[in-house]
C-alpha cells in the first residue's frame, strides 16, 4: 500500500537533496529538487515533506536529523523508542542504569542539535511557497500546514531536552551576523511553537480517521494541547521550587494562559464528535488490542499513527518482548499505582498479601484491568507458537541476555501475541507507532482543567476521564476515594484533583515512552527519582522464591557471581527483586535537581556555531 510508495519517494528524494550538515542553521538544502524552481507543484511539496514522516530503522540512516514522529521499536534494555523509553523513568527498569536518572550524564556526551537541519529544510520550503503554481488549492494548503507542523515539532523536541533555543524561521545567510543569535527565553520559544501550530491548524485539512497516515487539523490541535500543557506545568512547578529552569519573566497570568490554550485546543477536538475511545465492550482486551494491531486506520481513537508492515518497514518489539524479557521490566512503582477494581489506592496489607502469590496483584478481578493488559499475568500467551501452560513465572534467567526479565514484571503492552510474521528476526515486527490518540486529548484537557481550578472543574474532569474508565469497567472518578496519602506515595502532598489526574495519565499512558517528560515538566525528580531505586515483584516471601521453574539457577546474596539482586538482607521476611547490582547506588538515584532537568549543550554549539552567543544550561 502507501508504505512502499512513501519509501521509494523518500529514497529518491534523499539522493537528489544530499541532506547533510551538523546544525546547519545557515545552509540551504544542497543539490536540486526535481525542477530548477523548487516547489513549483504540490506533488513536489508532498515528496519533499515525505522525508519528515520517516523514522528509523536506524540501520537505514538516510537522514541527518531526528524523526518527525515518534518511532516504535525496542532495543535490548529498552532504548529510546515508544515501547522502551519508559526505562528512563520510574515506570520501567533496565539491565543498565539510566545515566540521566543516576546523575551520570556528562558534558562529553552532549550531542549535535541535528533538528536544526530539519528546521533549515522546512524554512527553505516555507520561504519558497510563492513558486507553487497551485497556490491556494486544497493540496497546497495541506502541505503548507504540514511544514508548519513539522517545524513546530522539531523545535518542541529540542525544547523538551534543552530549554531555551534560538528561533530561526528563515534560511539564514551564512555571511551575515544575524546567524550569531543568543538563546531566547523559554516563553518566546513556546509561544513561537504554538504560533506555528495555529498556522498548521489553519492550513491543514480535516480528517475523520487516520487512514492517510498524514497530519491533519486535529493532530496539530493535539500537539498544541501537549505543548501548552508542557510549558504551563514546567513554568508553574519549576517556579514554585525557585530553581534555575523556569523563565524568570513568566507571570502567573502567563502560566494560566498556557493552561487555557491546552484546554481550548483539546476542546476543539472533543467538540467535533468524530473521535472516541476504542471500546467494543471487551473490558479485558480492548485496551491491549489497540497497541498491537497493525492497521489502525479504522480505530476511532487513533488520530495519527505510523504503520509497520514487518517487511520493508519493521521493528524489534516482538523480537525482544515476546518471551517476557527484553532485559527490562515494569517497576513495582507503576504496578502499585493502578487502583483496585473498586477505585481505591492499592496500599497496606492488601498489597502485601496479594503479592505473596505472584500474579495475584495483577488480576483484573482485583485491580484496574489496564494493568493485566500492560503487564503479563501467569497464563498469558505471548507468541502464537507458545504451548500451554504459557507464561508461568517471569524469566529471571533468560535463554539469552535479551530474553531476561529484570523486575519480575514482564511488559505485555505492544507485544503482538498473534503475529503471523517472523517472530525473532531483527526489524520484522509490525507493532504500530501511535502518535496521538483520543485518550491524549482527554488527559490533556483534564490535567489543564485541574491546574486551572480543580474544585470548579471537578465535574468536567470526571466527565473527560469517564470514557477511559468505561472501556475497562472501572468506576467513575471519585477524588476523595482515590486520594492516596500513604507516606511512601510521591504525590501525597498534591491536591486531590491534580493527584488523581496525574495517576490516570500514568496508568493510561504506561510504557508509551512519555513518563520522563512528565516528571521533568512537573519538577518532580526530588519526589520520584532522587534517592529512589527501582524494585519489582516480591521474591522472598512469595511463591517465586522456591518455584520449581527456577530450581537452583538463581544465585543471590553471594560475594560474587550473583544473577539476581534483592532488596534488604538475608533473613528479612519480604524482599523484592531489583533490576541491577546496587553496588555504588546504595543511596539510590543521584539525579542532580540543579542540573539534570536539561541536557548539556555541545561545546561546539557554544563557540563556533553561534559565535559565543549561546550560554550553557544551568549546572553544566
At which residue positions do the language-model features occur?
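Sec-dependent bacterial lipoprotein signal peptides
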Residues: 1-20
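Long, intrinsically disordered, low-complexity segments
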Residues: 22, 115-118, 192, 283-340, ...
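Membrane-proximal, proline-rich intrinsically disordered regions
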Residues: 22-70, 354-356, 365, 602-620
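Short, surface-exposed recognition loops and adjoining beta-strand edges that mediate ligand/DNA contacts
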Residues: 36, 63-83, 168-170, 205-222, ...
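Conserved, well-structured interaction surfaces
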Residues: 46-59, 84-162, 176-191, 195-212, ...
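Alpha-helical solenoid repeat scaffolds, predominantly canonical TPR units
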Residues: 121, 189, 196, 240, ...
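Short coil/turn linking the two alpha-helices of tandem helical-hairpin repeats
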Residues: 159-166, 208, 230-239, 451-455
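Active/binding-pocket-proximal capping segment
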Residues: 439-445, 455-485
Amino acid at each position: 500500500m502507501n508504505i512502499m510508495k512513501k519509501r521509494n519517494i523518500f529514497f529518491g528524494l534523499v539522493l537528489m537533496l544530499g541532506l547533510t550538515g551538523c546544525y546547519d542553521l545557515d545552509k540551504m538544502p544542497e543539490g536540486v529538487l526535481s525542477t530548477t524552481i523548487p516547489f513549483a507543484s504540490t506533488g513536489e511539496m508532498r515528496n519533499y515533506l515525505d522525508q519528515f514522516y520517516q523514522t528509523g530503522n536506524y540501520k537505514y540512516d538516510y537522514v541527518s536529523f531526528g524523526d518527525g514522529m515518534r518511532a516504535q521499536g525496542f532495543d535490548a534494555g529498552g532504548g529510546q523508542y515508544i515501547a522502551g523509553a519508559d526505562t528512563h523513568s520510574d515506570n520501567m527498569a533496565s539491565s543498565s542504569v539510566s545515566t540521566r536518572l543516576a546523575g551520570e550524564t556528562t558534558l562529553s556526551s552532549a550531542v549535535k542539535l541535528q533538528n536544526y537541519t530539519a528546521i533549515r529544510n522546512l524554512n527553505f520550503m516555507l520561504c519558497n511557497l510563492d513558486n507553487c503554481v497551485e497556490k491556494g488549492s486544497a493540496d497546497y494548503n495541506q502541505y503548507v500546514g504540514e511544514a508548519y507542523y513539522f517545524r513546530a515539532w522539531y523545535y518542541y523536541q529540542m525544547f523538551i531536552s534543552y530549554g531555551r533555543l534560538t528561533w530561526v524561521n528563515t534560511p539564514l545567510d551564512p555571511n551575515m551576523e544575524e546567524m550569531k543569535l543568543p538563546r531566547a527565553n523559554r516563553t518566546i520559544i513556546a509561544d513561537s511553537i504554538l504560533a506555528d501550530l495555529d498556522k498548521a491548524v489553519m492550513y491543514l485539512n480535516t480528517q475523520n480517521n487516520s487512514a492517510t497516515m498524514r497530519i491533519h487539523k486535529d493532530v496539530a490541535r493535539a500537539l498544541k494541547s501537549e505543548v501548552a500543557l508542557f510549558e504551563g506545568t514546567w513554568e508553574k512547578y519549576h517556579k514554585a521550587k525557585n530553581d534555575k529552569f523556569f523563565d524568570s519573566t513568566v507571570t502567573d497570568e502567563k502560566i494560566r494562559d498556557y493552561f487555557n490554550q491546552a484546554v481550548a485546543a483539546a476542546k476543539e477536538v472533543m467538540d467535533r464528535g468524530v473521535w472516541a475511545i476504542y471500546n467494543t465492550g471487551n473490558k479485558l482486551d480492548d485496551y491491549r488490542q489497540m497497541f498491537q494491531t497493525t492497521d489502525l486506520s479504522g480505530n476511532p481513537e487513533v488520530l495519527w499513527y505510523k504503520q509497520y508492515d514487518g517487511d520493508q518497514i519493521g521493528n524489534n518489539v516482538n523480537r525482544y518482548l515476546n518471551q517476557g524479557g527484553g532485559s527490562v521490566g515494569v517497576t513495582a512503582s507503576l504496578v502499585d499505582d493502578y487502583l483496585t477494581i473498586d477505585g481505591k489506592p492499592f496500599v497496606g496489607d492488601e498489597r502485601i498479601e496479594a503479592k505473596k502469590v505472584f500474579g495475584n496483584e495483577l488480576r483484573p478481578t482485583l485491580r484496574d484491568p489496564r494493568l493485566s493488559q500492560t503487564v503479563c499475568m501467569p497464563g498469558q500467551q505471548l507468541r502464537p507458537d507458545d504451548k500451554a501452560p504459557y507464561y508461568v513465572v517471569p524469566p529471571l534467567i533468560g535463554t539469552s541476555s535479551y530474553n531476561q526479565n529484570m523486575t519480575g514484571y514482564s511488559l505485555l503492552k505492544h507485544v503482538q501475541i498473534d503475529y503471523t510474521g517472523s517472530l525473532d528476526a531483527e526489524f520484522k515486527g509490525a507493532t504500530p507507532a501511535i502518535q496521538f490518540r483520543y485518550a491524549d486529548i482527554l488527559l490533556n484537557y483534564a490535567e489543564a482543567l485541574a491546574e486551572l481550578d480543580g474544585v470548579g472543574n471537578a465535574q468536567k474532569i470526571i466527565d473527560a476521564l469517564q470514557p477511559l474508565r468505561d472501556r475497562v469497567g472501572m468506576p467513575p472518578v471519585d477524588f476523595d476515594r482515590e486520594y492516596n496519602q500513604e507516606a511512601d506515595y510521591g504525590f501525597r502532598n498534591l491536591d486531590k484533583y491534580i493527584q488523581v489526574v496525574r495517576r490516570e495519565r500514568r496508568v493510561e499512558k504506561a510504557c508509551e515512552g512519555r513518563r520522563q517528560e512528565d516528571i521533568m515538566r512537573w519538577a518532580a525528580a526530588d519526589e520520584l527519582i532522587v534517592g529512589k531505586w527501582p524494585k519489582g515483584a516480591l521474591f522472598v516471601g512469595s511463591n517465586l522464591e522456591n518455584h520449581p521453574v527456577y530450581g537452583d539457577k538463581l544465585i543471590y546474596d553471594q560475594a560474587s557471581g550473583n544473577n539476581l539482586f534483592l532488596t534488604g538482607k538475608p533473613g528479612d521476611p519480604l524482599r523484592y527483586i531489583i533490576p541491577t547490582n546496587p553496588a555504588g547506588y546504595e543511596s539510590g538515584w543521584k539525579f542532580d535537581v540543579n542540573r539534570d532537568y536539561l541536557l548539556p549543550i555541545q561545546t561546539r554549539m557554544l563557540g563556533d556555531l553561534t559565535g559565543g552567543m549561546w550560554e550553557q544550561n544551568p549546572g553544566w
